[in-house]
Amino acid sequence: MAKTKISEYSATPASNTDISNINIAEGCSPANVNNAIRSVMAQLKDQQDGTSGDPFTVAGTLTSSGTLAVTGALTLD
């Protein structure tokens, strides 16, 4: 499966052999490394912007000062 967003990566490093269908397995083309890094950077930006469809969960304590603007649903336990 092509890993096209951050939530699709595995916590097991050896399982992450592609990024957006770009081969990053051992022995891959050096050009693939450049393309994969660019793809990860775009995926991180999509997650930051909220356009990837990935939920973002914060565990523990979140302290904020200032204004909190929420668009959509907000669940507090």
Task: Explain the meaning of each model-derived region.
Residues G27-Q48:
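Long amphipathic alpha-helical coiled-coil
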Residues M1-S20:
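Short, intrinsically disordered N-terminal pre-domain segments
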Residues T4-K5, V40, Q47-D77:
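Intrinsic low-complexity, repeat-rich intrinsically disordered segments enriched
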Residues S20-N23, A31:
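N-terminal alpha-helical targeting/anchoring segments
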Residues I24-G27, T75:
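Intrinsic disorder/low-complexity segments
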Residues P13-S15, A31, L74:
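Intrinsic disorder/low-complexity signature
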